[in-house]
């Protein structure tokens, strides 16, 4: 398969959370173009079945292939847990997820071998973070906690709100009691609540946000495949954004967290794919 190295990277998530990954790609791979898709009509993914998540992921990848992307980042932990293996087998394009990079950092950082994971019901229920961590270091004890209200709170824009603080305190108490020294933010929405989580967990707990590590993993993949952009193609709009619903709301949120002025977000009918 002949892939154009100046083609964009496809990035997708259930909503706005994957923007934390897109942001790190922008910062660390500035020559790369991005096509981002947020499945805002069907968020959250965390409560959906594995079969449904695989179907959604296939639809989105078909759409991204239509945009002629050269590689795809599944910037969603639930889709990475449930769909990554299936779509890698099915599509002839390099695809990475966000779970392995985070697990590798957590295994390297923990001192007391007690690692916490927070994520959606689907991600936590899959046990995939624990599986990766145990492969890396069998002596690690893993404590997982589903935090299903975090995604709706982020999508609502309640990043600094007393309600969010109260919800976070209730969710995280269990992990505080387990004395974890490292906490994986196992959903790409959760870094947007980092300051709240930090306040509750304290300064001594290492918070692992896989977005940065995922950008580095993407960089390694592109180099390995000979697909890194040489930055010779100038483009007035290097970053394009698509959603399945609520385009204006998405655009406003994206502009609040990205180091780039998002001028247009286009709504598409993802069910066609």
Task: Show the residue positions of the predicted features.
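Non-catalytic structural scaffold of enzyme domains
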Residues: 1-273
């Amino acid at each position: 398969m002949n892939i154009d190295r100046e083609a964009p990277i496809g990035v997708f998530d259930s909503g706005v959370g994957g923007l934390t990954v897109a942001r790190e790609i922008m910062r660390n791979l500035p020559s790369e173009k991005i096509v981002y898709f947020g499945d805002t009509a069907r968020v959250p993914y965390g409560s959906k079945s594995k079969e449904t998540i695989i179907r959604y992921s296939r639809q989105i990848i078909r759409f991204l292939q239509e945009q002629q992307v050269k590689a795809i980042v599944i910037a969603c932990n639930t889709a990475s847990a449930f769909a990554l293996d299936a779509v890698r087998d099915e599509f002839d394009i390099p695809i990475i997820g966000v779970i392995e990079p985070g697990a590798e950092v957590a295994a390297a950082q923990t001192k007391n071998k007690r690692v916490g994971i927070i994520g959606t019901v689907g991600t936590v229920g899959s046990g995939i973070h624990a599986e990766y961590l145990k492969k890396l270091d069998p002596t690690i004890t893993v404590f997982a906690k589903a935090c299903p209200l975090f995604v709706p709170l982020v999508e609502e824009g309640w990043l600094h709100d007393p309600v969010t603080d109260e919800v976070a305190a209730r969710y995280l108490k269990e992990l505080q009691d387990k004395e974890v020294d490292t906490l994986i933010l196992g959903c790409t929405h959760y870094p947007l609540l980092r300051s709240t989580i930090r306040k509750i967990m304290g300064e001594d707990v290492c918070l692992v946000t896989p977005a940065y590590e995922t950008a580095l993993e993407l960089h390694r993949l592109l180099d390995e495949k000979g697909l890194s952009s040489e930055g010779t193609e100038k483009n007035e709009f290097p970053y394009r954004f698509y959603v399945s619903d609520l385009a204006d709301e998405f655009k406003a949120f994206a502009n609040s967290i990205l180091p780039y002025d998002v001028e247009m977000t286009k709504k598409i009918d993802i069910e066609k794919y």
